[in-house]
Amino acid sequence: AMGAEVVLTRSDVGKGHPEYYQDLAAKIAADTPGAYFINQFGNPDNPAAHQASTGPEIIEQMAEAGGFDAIVFGCGSSGTMTGLSRCFAEHAPQVELVLADPGGSILTQYINEGVLSDKSGSWLVEGIGEDFLPSAMDITVVDAIERAGDRESFLWARQLVRQEGIFAGGSSGSAIAGAIKYCRKLPAGRIPVVILPDSG
C-alpha cells in the first residue's frame, strides 16, 4: 500500500552473515540513495525513548493504583529493558526487573552463568530472545529471569484474548508466562507490571 519493497531474510544464519536480517538491512541502506538504517539494536535513542516516556508513564499510572514491585518484559532490541531500568533506577529503585526469555535465546545462560554462547537455539515467538548482545543493551540491570517456552507463550496469548479481549502475540504471551512463574515465587500482595508489546 505504501510502495515499499519487502525483503524476506533467512532465519538460519547468524549475525555477521550477509543474509542475516540486520546485516542485510545495513547493506540495503548503504546501497540505496536516501536510505537510512535506524539500527534499533545499537541506536541510543531506542532506550532513551523508553527512559523518557514509557517509564514515567508506568510510574504515574501505577502510583494511582498504589505502586508496583516488579516489571516483567521480553527483550528484543533491549530498548524497553535498558530504558526502563534507567528510569526506575532514578525514580523507582525498589522495582525489580524481570526478563521473560524464550527457550533457545542466549540471554538466560549469559545472565545466570556469565557464559556468552555463540550458538543460539531456535524459537517460534517473534520479537524477543537474542542470538547476540545488542550494543544498546545493559544486561546488568536484570534482577530475575524466567524461561518462557513457545507452547506456553502461545497458550497465554490465546488466554489473554479469550479472558481479557486483548489481541496480542506470542511475545506478550511470553511476558505473561514469565510473570506467572515469577509471581509464584513471591509472597502474596506483590504487584507486577507486565509489558505487552502489541497494539492489541
Q: Which stretches of residues belong to each language-model region?
A:
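Short glycine/serine/threonine-rich phosphate/pyrophosphate-binding segments
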Residues: 1, 74-85, 107-108, 171-179
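A glycine-rich helix N-cap at a beta->alpha junction
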Residues: 2-24
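Residues at the starts of beta-strands that form the adenosine-phosphate
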Residues: 5, 94-96, 191
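Short beta-strand segments
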Residues: 10, 39-40, 73-75, 99-101, ...
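Active-site/ligand-binding loops adjacent to catalytic centers
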Residues: 22, 29, 34, 89-170
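Active-site/ligand-binding-proximal alpha/beta "capping" segment
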Residues: 32-78, 84, 139, 143, ...
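Terminal helix/beta-alpha structural elements that buttress the NAD(P)+-binding lobe
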Residues: 68-70, 95, 170-174, 182
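Phosphate-binding loop/pocket of nucleotide- and phosphate-handling active sites
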Residues: 122, 177-200
